[in-house]
Structures are given as C-alpha cells and as structure tokens.
Amino acid sequence: MGTGLAHAPVRDACKNTVPGPGAKGIGTGFIRNYQKWQELCVNMDTICENVPVDTSYNFFGKQVALPVFAAPVGAMQLHYGDKYDDLTYNDILVTACADAGIAAFTGDGTNPAVIQAAAEALKKNHGCGVPTIKPWNIDLVREKAELVGAADPIAVAMDIDAAGLPFLKNLTPPAGSKTVDELKEIVKLMNGKPFSLKGIMTVNGAKKAL
C-alpha cells in the first residue's frame, strides 16, 4: 500500500490525505461505514438438513461459488503506491477471482490505460468479471462500453457515487451526476448486457434508478 497510509489496527488515521481510501471532505465516510458494518452479524440456523451448505449464487446467468465480489479499483499507482500497475493488478485480481469461483469488479480512471488493462484481464478470463465505468460524458461512456463489451463481461457497472469527484466535474464537457433519461441512454449502450449502478446513496435514488 506504500508509505502514504498511517499504521493503525483500524484504518482510520488517513482520512482526507490519500486519494480513494482516505475519503474526501471531513473524511468520515469510510469510518462511519466501517462502524455500521460492526452492527451486522450472521445468524446461524441449525434447523435444516444435515448436508453441506450450498453458497453458490446465480449472478446474471453466471454461477459463482459465493456471492462475494472484489471491489473495483483503478489507478493503482496513484492511490496505493508503485508496486503494481493497473495491468499487473487486474491480471492478478481477475484471474484469482475466476480461479476461486467468484468474480472481480474492475476499476476505471482518467488514464485510458486503466480500463484497457481491465478489459484485457477480463478477455483473458473469458469475461469473468464486471468492468466499472465512471459517470463520464455520454461520448466517453460509449467509447468505454465498446471497449469492455469486446471482453464479453458478465455485466457492466457504473460507480455513480463518483459523480462528486473533482477530477470528473472539472472535465470539459463535465462528467458527474446523471438524470434518469441519461441513464436510460447509457443502458442502451450496453448492447443487452446487464447494467448495475454502484453507489446509490438513498432510497429515492434507488427508486429513480429502477
């Protein structure tokens, strides 16, 4: 992870100092999310057949061993240090997830090489993964959708919560938040592939996404 992160048993010392994991603003978003996760527990039900538990799940037509997926990460050297570039990281991640019977979501960034590396890794692993496109302007979304579509992924995602990132909002034309009509247009660009919106923050947002 490089030297940019402070050492702490619970990773809460780097808020607003590191792109991505450090969060933005007052830097409490990830901390509050982690605290909320501590309230969730798995309850065991022993009144059932005494057979091995089946954890498999049908994910958009792809049978996976467990409904747990690797999160999309892009621009590795910008965020996490210089040990892995995007090509190496995606090759390791997508391959390892496919070998484990699950799937990886892959990241995106302002550098075209980020999603190109993701597409190459997905193609190498027979499309076993979900490329995640940031909420760029429609022309760039179209370009990236065509690129990842050639890898025949399970689905395509968009991390719409990235709409507040300054490097997106300051582009010309600007990227960022999307209207319902804009999302409908984006869905059409997926050529029938399932489309997932990551980072919907409210119930009202979820209703509009439907």
Positions of the model-derived regions?
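An N-cap/entry alpha-helix motif that binds or orients negatively charged groups
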Residues: 1-64
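Glycine- and other small-residue-rich loops at beta-strand/loop junctions that grip anionic moieties
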Residues: 22, 82, 106-109, 133-134, ...
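Short, charged beta->alpha transition segments
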Residues: 51-61, 90-93, 107-120, 144-146
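Active-site cofactor/substrate anionic-group-binding motifs, chiefly glycine-
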Residues: 59-110
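Hydrophobic faces of well-ordered beta-strands that scaffold small-molecule active sites
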Residues: 68-71, 102-106, 127-133, 156, ...
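Short glycine-enriched loops at secondary-structure junctions
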Residues: 76, 108-113, 161, 203
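Alpha/beta enzyme core
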Residues: 95, 124, 136-210
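Long, hydrophobic, well-ordered secondary-structure blocks that form the structural core
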Residues: 113-139
